[in-house]
UniProtKB/Swiss-Prot annotation:
Oligomeric form and interacting partners: Homodimer; disulfide-linked.
Organism: Mus musculus (Mouse)
Keywords: Disulfide bond, Secreted, Signal
Induction notes from the record: Up-regulated by Imiquimod. Up-regulated in skin upon tissue inflammation and injury.
Family: Belongs to the IGFL family.
Subcellular location: Secreted
GO cellular component terms given for this protein: extracellular space
Keyword check for Ligase: no
Protein name: Insulin growth factor-like family member
Tissues expressed in: Highly expressed in skin. Also detected in colon, thymus, mammary gland, lymph node and lung.
Amino acid sequence: MKIRNACAVLIEVLLFILEGVTGARKISTFSGPGSWPCNPKCDGRTYNPSEECCVHDTILPFKRINLCGPSCTYRPCFELCCPESYSPKKKFIVKLKVHGERSHCSSSPISRNCKSNKIFHGEDIEDNQLSLRKKSGDQP
């Protein structure tokens, strides 16, 4: 029994050395823009899923910030901007997108209510060069 185990170990070591010398095993790397194993596409264009997303046939960076109503922001790669009411005073809710599923306002979990929480991510707004309106009482 010990001889069989020793032979198996010896064979494995020899195969390992042989692979290193001859380069028999090729390891593929995914460093180029068109070399992703599944080549995710958005409207026919390939994109990098570790840095970008596809929303309505448009490639967006993960840092992208959009307005949800007049006073709230959301990240379209990770969240949905959903109308809560269609009255003249429209109310909006930000909902989370569920990874791996097609997200809809009717079935996604609520992240926050835009009317009660005015959340602005300063660094994200600066990255996207969004401008904020000054309060009406502020002087220039």
